[in-house]
Amino acid sequence: MTASDCRSIDQAFLAQQWPSRQATLERYLQEQSRGLRQVFVAEDSGQIAGYATLIPHAKAGPFKKNGYPEITDLNVFQNFQRQGIGAKLLQAAEEQAKTFSSVITIGVGLHS
């Protein structure tokens, strides 16, 4: 992910009537530069379609003590859903995780 991607992703959230995620995305960019997170960005025809992040060691939850990598914050924007983009993002994160672990986890949030 680049600084430009942060702005484009935030604009995509705003276009969907979601709150700004700029601060979170900038934190992801900083963590990526320090090797604490990897961000996978999907594009379609030059537009940001979605993204997923991979952290090398779960920071919370039942897998924290095992040090397993965790896929977090998977988003595919509405205009790009049902095209296999989410599956490709998951596959990219899984392939990267395979380079340093035989186990991978996924963190999910529950929203009402």
PLM features: residue spans?
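Active-site rim helix/loop that mediates acceptor-substrate recognition in acyltransferases
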Residues: 18-41
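Conserved acetyl-CoA-binding loop-helix of GNAT-fold acetyltransferases
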Residues: 76, 82-95
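Conserved GNAT acetyl-CoA-binding A-motif
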Residues: 97-111
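Conserved beta-strand in the GNAT
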Residues: 41, 47-58, 70-75
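Conserved acetyl-CoA binding element of GNAT-fold acetyltransferases
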Residues: 64-78, 106-109
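Hydrophobic alpha-helical core bundles mediating ligand binding, dimerization, or RNAP-core interactions
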Residues: 9-14, 25
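A short beta-loop-alpha structural element at the N-terminal edge
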Residues: 1-9
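N-terminal first-folded block
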Residues: 14-20, 60
